[in-house]
Amino acid sequence: MGSRGLFERARKVIPSGVNSPVRYYAPYPFFAASASGGSIRDADGRKYTDLCNGYGALLLGHGRGEVVRAVSAQLRRGTLFCVPTEQEVELARLISGNYPSMESTRLVNTGGEATMTAIRLARGFTKRDRIIKFDGCYHGAHGSVLVKAGSGSAHLGISTSEGVPRGLARQTTVIPYNDEAAFEGAAADDVAAVIVEPVMGNMGVIPPKKGFLRLLRKLSSRLGMQLIFDETITGFRLSAGGAQEAFGVRPDITTLAKALGGGLPIAAVGGKKNIMERLAPGGSVYEASTFAGNPVSVSAALASIRTINRIKGRLYPRLERAAAALASSIADDAADLGLDRQINRVASIFQVFFTAEPVTDAASAKRADAARFDKMFRALLKNGVFVAPSQFEMASLSAAHTVEDLRNVSAAYRTALGAAR
C-alpha cells in the first residue's frame, strides 16, 4: 500500500494520521518503508537523500554498522531488566568524559522528559518556582515550556498549548532570544532556572550572538539561577562535547537526546553532583520511569558515543566543510534568482529563510516567507531530497552523506529555489 492509502487508514486510528504534529503536511506525508546510510525510501518506492535525519538525531546516518551490531547483540541478551546494568554505568562515564559539566547523569527516555526533570530539579534545588525561557525555543511537550514554543507549535501557530494551566504558564517568563537587555531585566533572585537551546534548532537555526551565552552564565551565577543547556539538538552535533564545548560556556544542568541514541529513544539529564544528588532516592526531587536505562537504547548510545569519539578528528571537520559548501551554494543560487534569503548555519545544521533581514530570534524567523519555504520543500521532495516540512525546523548532514549525495542535494536546491521564486 502506498503513502496515500496508508494515510487514509492512519486517519481512522491515529489523531490527524500522525504521531507528531510536524510530520504532517498537506495533502498527506510520505510513509517511510526503509532507510539506509544517508537516504530514506517511502512506501511508494521513491528514494530521498535525507536531510531531516530524524530531526538531527542521525548524526551517523541510518543503520550505522556499529550501532546495528550493538543493538542486535543486546536484543539477544535481553530487552528490559528494570534493575541497574554495567552498561548504564559505562554510558554515564562516557557522557561525563565528553561533557565535564555532567558530573552525574540520570538516564531518561526523551528530550522532553529530560528537560522536565531538569526544570523540576532546578526548582527543588533552589526552592524557587519561576523559570525563564526564550521565545521560540522548544524544550518538549510539557507544561512549563509549552509557552511560546518553537518546532511544530510555531509551525501550527499555537503560541501556548491548550491544557496548560494558567497558573503553571505564569511561572514561565518568556523573553526574546539573543536580547541581552531583556534577559538582564528578567533575571532575578526568585528565578529557579534559565533554560535555553544554546543554538536555536526549533525555530530554524539561530545561533547565539557573541557573548550572549556568557551573559546567561554570568547572571545565573550571580543570582543563584540554574543555567540549563537543552542540548537535545546540539549535543554531539556541534562537537563531541556539544555547544558547551563549542562556545566554551558550562551550564549547571545539561540535557542530551537525539544524537545520543544513534536513532533509538534515549536521553540524559546531568549536572553538578550537588544538584543531581537531589534526585530520589537520595534526595526528594522525584523522577522515575520503567524504561529509563533501557538496555537496548543504552547499547545504541554506547556504540554511538564510542564511534563519534573514535572518528571525531575527521568527522566534524568533514561535516563543517560539506555544510559550509552547501550553504554557500544555496546562497549563491538564491542570489542569482533574485530571492531575498538568509542561510543560517552552525556546524552541520542549517536553514533557509526567505527574508532580507537577519534572522536572530523568533520574531524575525516568523517574518520570513513561510509560503515560499513550502514551495521549496515540495520541490525538494519532487527532486529527491527530504527536509523537515517547516521553516521552523532545520536541515542537517550526517556522516553517511557522500560527495555524490551532496552534489545531488545542491542541484535539487537549485531547482527548488527556482520553483519558490
Swiss-Prot record:
InterPro entries: 4pyrrol_synth_GluAld_NH2Trfase (IPR004639), Aminotrans_3 (IPR005814), PyrdxlP-dep_Trfase (IPR015424), PyrdxlP-dep_Trfase_major (IPR015421), PyrdxlP-dep_Trfase_small (IPR015422). Keywords: Cytoplasm, Isomerase, Porphyrin biosynthesis, Pyridoxal phosphate. The modification N6-(pyridoxal phosphate)lysine is found at K258. It catalyses: (S)-4-amino-5-oxopentanoate = 5-aminolevulinate. Pathway: Porphyrin-containing compound metabolism; protoporphyrin-IX biosynthesis; 5-aminolevulinate from L-glutamyl-tRNA(Glu): step 2/2. Its EC number is 5.4.3.8. Belongs to the class-III pyridoxal-phosphate-dependent aminotransferase family. HemL subfamily. NCBIfam families: PRK00062.1 (NF000818). PANTHER family: GLUTAMATE-1-SEMIALDEHYDE 2,1-AMINOMUTASE, GLUTAMATE-1-SEMIALDEHYDE 2,1-AMINOMUTASE 1, CHLOROPLASTIC-RELATED. This is Glutamate-1-semialdehyde 2,1-aminomutase 1. It comes from Cenarchaeum symbiosum (strain A).
